[in-house]
């Protein structure tokens, strides 16, 4: 962050002087704005899809026993232990073989597969901590399975759903490897930042962008911690 305020384009000590020109330059970089918008779209879409699928998978695994259950869970959780580069290359090969274009939605697909195991772990814990007698009482009172799930179970696991969404959004926003392999002409923010490092003259601007991201992350974390403290 210190070098983002340095008036020189050379990243070295001693500093030449103080300036905020690098931050002002960010306002006029349309490619940066497009990359940020793309990342927000991908992160929001991926976290929502992963949370929906993860909630359904966690509900099925915690509530029902069926043939192939363990194998299915192991297959879904594979991205947790596989290197991201293997996941990215594998998805790239599959998409090319199917003749599908590489765009933001291919990145959404990759990020959804990457985030989904985390969502399942979070929602599994939420469902396992539920009092099953509440569900049974709802059914005994004449509510349907779907109505019970919507009116009783979902409100109880709401904290888990929000945790899954926030974690998924953060992981997707920060992810580089899968986005690098699956993106087309529309780049995400991490890929855009990586491309700037090839041009030394762009380093101060990159440092300024990094400073803003650190500031936003710190403020968000402090706000969440304060909210948790008030809640408790």
Each model region followed by its residue ranges:
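A membrane-interface signal for the N-terminal entry of alpha-helical transmembrane segments
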Residues: 35-45, 201-224
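Membrane-helix interface segments
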Residues: 63-72, 100-104, 145, 159-160, ...
